Regions:
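Conserved N-terminal beta1-alpha1 strand-loop-helix module at the mouth
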Residues: 1-91, 96-124, 140, 150-159, ...
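A short acidic, helix-capping loop that chelates divalent metal ions and anchors anionic groups
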Residues: 74, 131-137
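Conserved acetyl-CoA-binding loop-helix of GNAT-fold acetyltransferases
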Residues: 144-147
Length: 208
């Protein structure tokens, strides 16, 4: 099984790119050092999603591409992996469907969720929201650094912190035990995509 060899996990939302083409924004981020992208475009019809994945595989050969929830697309196109929600198919079921080289990520929102993900065989988890952020308010109030610290002490699983992550906050979550960070608007909405990416990468690596 391939290792989790990235610390910055870019999650997509083509509606948050300030009108710029998603593929162009992602290409700039990858050029600046992003090595893992989760394609999270839930409102796209399946054929459009399939075509977009193929385009990204051509345009972003240096990035591991994860598909949110659509295990069928991930398996059919042999992407870098698949990313599940807590309401998705169980991780253990999905694991049996994946190619050996594919990684399995899981989004969780509590300490119990982190521990369950490890037991189910996920390769890594995305935990949050750590800080307040509009895109994550549907999951409830921020859980804060304390839950992150507790989770990092209880599992061996790589934990990516999400929710309101900026370059300054990236240092704090790394110090709290996060393996890495997952971001959307901090990169997608930045005026200078490459600079925003480099700032986050520098912050993440301080305590590596």
């Amino acid at each position: 099984m391939s290792p989790v060899d990235f610390r910055l996990y870019l999650v997509t939302d083509r509606h948050q790119t300030a009108g710029r083409p998603l593929v162009s924004v992602l290409a700039q981020a990858v050029r600046a050092g992003v090595r893992a992208v989760q394609l999270r475009e839930r409102d796209l019809p399946i054929r459009e999603l399939h075509a977009l994945v193929q385009e990204l595989q051509r345009e972003l050969p240096d990035a591991r591409l994860f598909i949110n929830d659509r295990v069928d697309v991930a398996v059919a196109l042999r992407t870098g992996g698949v990313h599940l929600r807590e309401s998705s198919l169980p991780a253990g079921v999905v694991r049996d469907l994946l190619w050996p080289s594919q990684l399995l990520g899981l989004s969780v929102h509590s300490l119990d969720g982190v521990m369950a993900a490890e037991q189910q065989g996920a390769d890594f988890v995305v935990l949050g929201p750590i800080y307040d952020t509009p895109s994550k308010r549907v999951y409830g109030p921020p859980i804060g650094l304390r839950i992150l610290e507790q989770a990092a002490q209880k599992v061996q699983l790589p934990i990516f912190a999400i929710g309101g992550i900026t370059a300054t906050r990236a240092r704090a979550v790394r110090q709290a035990g996060a393996f890495g960070v997952a971001v959307l608007s901090s990169i997608l909405g930045a005026e200078n995509i490459e600079q925003a990416t480099q700032d986050l990468l520098s912050a993440i690596e301080i305590d590596s």
